[in-house]
Regions:
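Active-site histidine-anchored catalytic micro-motif
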Residues: 1-130
């Protein structure tokens, strides 16, 4: 397993981690299998989405802010919206590996989704296969 450290600089942001996932795949030597990317935090997640236009991640964050506003929640730490956003994006993704490459679509990238930053974070990449 590969463990990556990440520092986020905003309260909410999507960080493109595709290069780190590709790096883990290269180091693993796996040609055919699956790459699992996992976030061990309850206020951050992992997703796959467009990486060609940075406005897409800005739009996604804007929509998440609209549908999950900062209101009074029972959870008193003040980060309930971050927990709910993580529920929507998820904590992991699985990406097929074919001929030593991530089987991502032409415009796809892997993102670490920060909803309660800035913070020091980690994410894990596990490559399985042959």
């Amino acid at each position: 397993m590969f463990i990556y450290d990440l520092h986020t600089y905003k309260k909410s942001t999507f960080v493109n981690i595709t290069s780190q996932v590709k790096d883990a795949l290269k180091k693993s030597g796996v040609q055919d299998g699956i790459a699992t990317v996992y976030c061990p935090h309850t206020t951050a997640g992992i997703t796959i989405n467009e990486n060609a236009d940075p406005d897409v991640t800005v739009d996604m964050l804007a929509v998440l802010e609209k549908i999950i506003p900062e209101v009074e929640f029972m959870h008193i730490e003040g980060n309930s919206p971050a927990h709910i956003k993580t529920l929507l994006t998820g904590s992991s993704v699985g990406i097929p590996v074919n001929d030593g490459n991530l089987a991502l679509g032409r415009w796809q990238g892997v993102y670490f989704c920060e909803y309660d930053g800035p913070r020091d974070r980690k994410f894990y990449v596990q490559i399985t296969g042959k």
